[in-house]
């Protein structure tokens, strides 16, 4: 019987749980065993009470149908888990070398004062390969219902784009009485997002741009293993490949981009735009770095490889687009100590005409002097 409802309990197949046994009494007092075998996977957390009736032939001789009799009662424990990343406090985690996870196990229908052992393991969802050693933790519940936490440390370096699931099992005297091992359960899962980028110059539609004043970089950011309906923040910054430092504009501000989005599916793309003055970038390479954050601004994925060609825009040399140098107007007159170089063009022609006229004048003067001498 289901103690909560007072009705006959039913197995996972939907059938009432009944059993009967015939026996021959060897004396006026004795015992007989009745064994119930059924699929009870649907009864986690339930309290079952065995009702017994004794017949001799078709005649009812005795009954024992007390819902409050503890000796007839079976407590079916239940366990549910909620996994979270210690850093984010959510089901998202950054795929770093050291990842701390916390699993909160909520149990029901345990026996207060008894000693139980909690067994937990972290596995990779697709392969169910272990990501941690099995952890064991003893506890003695004060009440039938309650919760207990267990912590795990794993290496998440290779988990970008993958999902980790925490499996839990409660045992008493070495026997399993409750477990939660569903690889599809979101509550048990930790999601490690993954992003990739493909940058291009807006005008050329390639990864090569012109070193001109107003230039635009469009970055197509692909994502994997996000939770549909959740809110995410994408932040980007432009990097100078030569020195690996963040680029700044004329006001010494970083050249950044930012967008917020809510994916409809776990995988997809989102676009980021960057505006910059590229006049001084001829022959240089610009690399786009992207960081993905959850709604609470926790970093959960990034793409920050300075040598990634897909993230790189190269600007061609363009002499016409070079920034004009500043002219110093404070001292327009040249110093007298500086020797002037001969000029070319029209001014040079004037110099030649003056030289020619000077020569002719000298010749005429000399001729007049000779003529006067002869007359004398």
Where are these regions (language model features)?
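C-terminal low-complexity, Ser/Thr- and acidic/Pro-rich disordered "stalk" regions positioned immediately N-terminal
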Residues: 316-347
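Short beta-strand elements
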Residues: 60-78, 176-193, 298-321
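Short glycine/proline/serine/threonine-rich loop/turn segments at secondary-structure transition edges
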Residues: 38-50, 157-166, 278-288
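Short, solvent-exposed loop/edge segments of extracellular or virion-exposed proteins
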Residues: 80-91, 196-207, 328, 342
């Amino acid at each position: 019987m289901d103690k909560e409802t007072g009705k006959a309990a039913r197995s996972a197949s939907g059938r009432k749980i009944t059993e009967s046994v015939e026996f021959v009494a060897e004396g006026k007092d004795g015992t007989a065993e009745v064994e119930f075998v059924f699929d009870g996977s649907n009864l986690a957390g339930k309290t079952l009470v065995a009702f017994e009736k004794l017949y001799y032939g078709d005649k009812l001789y005795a009954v024992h149908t007390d819902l409050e009799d503890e000796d007839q009662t079976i407590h079916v424990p239940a366990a549910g888990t909620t996994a979270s990343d210690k850093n984010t406090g959510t089901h998202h985690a950054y795929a770093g070398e050291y990842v701390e996870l916390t699993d909160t196990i909520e149990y029901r229908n345990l026996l207060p004062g008894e000693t139980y052992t909690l067994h937990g393991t972290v596995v990779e969802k697709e392969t169910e390969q272990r990501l941690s050693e099995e952890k064991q933790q003893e506890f003695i519940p004060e009440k039938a219902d309650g919760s207990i936490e267990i912590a795990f440390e794993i290496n998440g370096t290779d988990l970008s784009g993958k999902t980790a699931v925490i499996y839990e099992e409660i045992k008493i005297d070495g026997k399993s009485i409750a477990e939660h091992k569903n690889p599809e359960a979101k509550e048990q899962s930790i999601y490690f997002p993954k992003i990739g980028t493909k940058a291009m110059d807006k005008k050329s539609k390639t990864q090569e741009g012109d070193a001109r004043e107003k230039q635009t970089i469009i970055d197509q950011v692909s994502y994997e293993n996000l939770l549909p309906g959740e809110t995410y923040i994408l932040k980007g910054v432009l990097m100078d490949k030569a020195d690996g430092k963040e680029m700044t504009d004329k006001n010494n501000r970083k050249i950044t981009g930012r967008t917020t989005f809510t994916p409809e599916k776990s995988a997809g793309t989102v676009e980021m735009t960057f505006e910059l003055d590229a006049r001084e970038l001829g022959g240089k390479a610009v690399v786009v770095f992207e960081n993905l954050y959850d709604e609470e601004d926790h970093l959960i994925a990034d793409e920050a490889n300075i040598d990634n060609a897909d993230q790189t825009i190269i600007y061609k040399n363009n002499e016409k687009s070079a920034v004009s140098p500043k002219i110093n107007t404070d001292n327009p007159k040249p110093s007298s100590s500086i020797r002037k170089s001969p000029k070319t063009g029209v001014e040079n022609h004037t110099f030649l005409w003056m030289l020619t006229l000077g020569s002719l004048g000298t010749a005429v003067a000399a001729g007049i002097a000779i003529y006067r001498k002869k007359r004398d």
